[in-house]
Amino acid sequence: MKKNNLKKIAKNVIDLEIQALKKLKNSINNSFNKTVSLISNCQSKVIFCGVGKSFIIASKISSTLSSVGSPSFAISASQCTHGDLGSITKKDLLILISNSGETEELKPVIQYAKRNKIILVGIVSKKNSVLYKSSDVKLYIPESKESGHGIVPTSSTTSQLALGDALAIASMNYKNFGKLDFKKFHPSGNLATKLKTVGDLMISGNKLPFVTENSNM
């Protein structure tokens, strides 16, 4: 394969994902507002669940939410039927992510949520799917063409991640979560360094060492 073809492939992949994001942007409706409200007012945990690539996306969204003031974690639907359903309580908000909405591993999780009256938000691209029909709040991601012969999760996972980022940032604004709040949950790394103030580094009071001209070396 010629190197120029590789560049063409890269640009095509990015173009497909840009198109998917434009579709997603135009699809944002009141279900988004409802989900932000549920996340921001949740008195327990926001739990994300998915399978395969969707679980990886779920983990990233969950991590972002936790860092901006909404306690969250992600669990793999594959593990739920082996005891992890016990992690989900009635006070939690459950958000399931699936492109098809028909993933077999998700069905017991949906049944558990319904049986225990746990609020269920579905992030899904198929309106005729079990997940879409079962969700209390439906976050629809328009179907888009995937790269790699149209079968590799690319455009769909990019859209899922973008929607998750939008939920997290909107929740930040909803809760008036500012830079100082963010610093409390992120005390290390380059981001924390940028947010440090003089007061964080300054030594004052009894901790400030003083010597006189007569002090011994």
Residue ranges and their predicted role:
Residues 1-13, 51-59, 193:
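Short, compositionally biased "basic patch" segments
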Residues 16, 23, 34, 38-41, ...:
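Alpha-helical scaffold segments in soluble metabolic enzymes
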Residues 11-16, 61, 65, 194-203:
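Short, basic/glycine-rich phosphate-binding loops at helix/coil junctions
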Residues 178-192:
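A short, charged, Gly/Pro-tolerant segment at domain boundaries
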Residues 20-21, 25-28, 96-102, 211-214:
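Short, glycine-rich nucleotide/cofactor-binding loops
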Residues 2-44:
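An N-terminal, well-structured beta->alpha segment
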Residues 44-175:
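Glycine-rich phosphate-binding loops that contact phosphosugars or nucleotide phosphates
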Residues 193-217:
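Bateman/CBS regulatory modules and CBS-like beta-alpha motifs in cytosolic regions of diverse proteins
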